[in-house]
């Protein structure tokens, strides 16, 4: 399997992301989420970034 095939296989799989343990106190650290997120191929346009 090459990198392209691997990437295509993973498009249909859910992934984990880092989430804060306590969103009101980020010093409590982070934990991995359940397998709930889909891989996104969204890439914002540089023109859409705020320059302020």
Swiss-Prot record:
Cite the InterPro entries for this sequence: DUF5354
- Which domain of life does the UniProt lineage start with? Eukaryota
Q: Give the protein's recorded name.
A: Uncharacterized protein C02B8.7
Tell me the lineage of the source organism: Eukaryota, Metazoa, Ecdysozoa, Nematoda, Chromadorea
